[in-house]
């Protein structure tokens, strides 16, 4: 079963690497300040993201409409 096919799971997409600096500049943050997501997360595996990728997560909210979050994929500790 694809995890992303469930209606409660928000859309996850990989941000192109060349767009990451623009994202960081827009929010005036450093890469390591983004919330983290482990490379073993089922959705990370499904979208084939690797450590260092940034995922754009788009959620629907009944009060705010569409909201966007960004997370940095990190490697699971050995």
Curated annotation (Swiss-Prot):
Pfam family, one: RNA_pol_Rpb5_C
Cellular location(s): Cytoplasm
PROSITE patterns reported for this sequence: RNA_POL_H_23KD
Swiss-Prot/TrEMBL catalytic activity: RNA(n) + a ribonucleoside 5'-triphosphate = RNA(n+1) + diphosphate
UniProt main location, coarse: cytoplasm
This protein's record includes keyword Protein transport: no
Gene Ontology molecular function: any one: DNA binding
Keyword set includes Protein transport: no
One of the protein's GO biological processes: transcription by RNA polymerase II
Function per UniProt: DNA-dependent RNA polymerase (RNAP) catalyzes the transcription of DNA into RNA using the four ribonucleoside triphosphates as substrates.
Quaternary structure, from the entry: Part of the RNA polymerase complex.
Family classification: Belongs to the archaeal Rpo5/eukaryotic RPB5 RNA polymerase subunit family.
Protein name: DNA-directed RNA polymerase subunit Rpo5
Organism: Methanococcus maripaludis (strain C5 / ATCC BAA-1333)
């Amino acid at each position: 079963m694809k995890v992303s096919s469930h209606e409660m799971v928000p859309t996850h997409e990989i941000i192109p690497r060349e767009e990451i600096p623009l994202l960081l500049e827009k929010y005036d943050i450093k890469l390591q300040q983004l919330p983290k997501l482990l490379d073993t997360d089922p959705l990370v595996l499904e979208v084939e993201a690797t450590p260092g990728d940034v995922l754009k997560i788009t959620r629907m909210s009944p009060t705010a409409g569409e909201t966007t979050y960004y997370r940095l994929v990190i490697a699971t500790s050995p």
